[in-house]
């Protein structure tokens, strides 16, 4: 379960985004809809621990993330949360396999990477560098990287934007 309470984000240019209190129950899927620039990606980035809120709290499975130690935050980011970024966040000069395999450095078991790549119809590009892939292929790699962790929580920021 994810609980958002009195959450807000202030940016240097004085832009402030405020969110309603929201509870995302475990085992359910949710979709955020809104105009460009309204803060959907910012909210996902705060839940993932990439951005810190200016006010309020994010509670994941009973743990208030703003009060958690960095070790606990890392445990959640690595083990509980898979994030499919809008702009892929892949390393262009590395292969598909290496972009997923790099998760091993964080202790993630990627032993079923090949099966994940096959299920997303990108296995044949396993040894290709990211810079040689189409947008849709890069999106599939980003999805595989998020899912290979078997996370409890999947955050997806426009995950099908480049798929055909």
Where are the regions a protein language model picked out?
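Helix-to-loop junction immediately C-terminal to a conserved catalytic motif
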Residues: 48
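Conserved ABC transporter NBD signature motif
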Residues: 56-64
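Conserved ABC ATPase "signature" region
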Residues: 64, 110-125
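ABC ATPase NBD coupling module
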Residues: 65-82
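Conserved ABC ATPase signature
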Residues: 129-133, 137-139
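Conserved catalytic motifs of ABC-family nucleotide-binding domains
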Residues: 150
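Catalytic Walker B motif of ABC-type/P-loop ATPase nucleotide-binding domains
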Residues: 154-157
């Amino acid at each position: 379960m994810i609980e958002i309470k009195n959450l807000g984000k202030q940016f240097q240019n004085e832009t402030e985004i405020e969110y309603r209190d929201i509870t995302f129950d475990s085992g359910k899927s949710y979709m955020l809809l809104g105009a460009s620039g309204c803060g959907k990606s910012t909210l996902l980035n705060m839940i993932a621990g990439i951005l810190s809120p200016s006010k309020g709290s994010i509670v994941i499975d009973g743990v208030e993330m703003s009060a958690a130690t960095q070790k606990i935050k890392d445990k959640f980011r690595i083990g509980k949360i898979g994030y499919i970024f809008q702009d892929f966040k892949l390393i262009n000069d590395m292969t598909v396999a290496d972009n997923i395999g790099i998760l091993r450095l964080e202790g993630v078991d990627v032993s079923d990477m090949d099966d994940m790549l096959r299920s997303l119809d990108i296995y044949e590009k396993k040894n290709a560098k990211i810079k040689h892939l189409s947008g849709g292929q890069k999106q599939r790699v980003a999805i595989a990287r998020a899912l290979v962790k078997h996370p409890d929580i999947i955050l997806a920021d426009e995950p099908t934007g480049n798929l055909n």
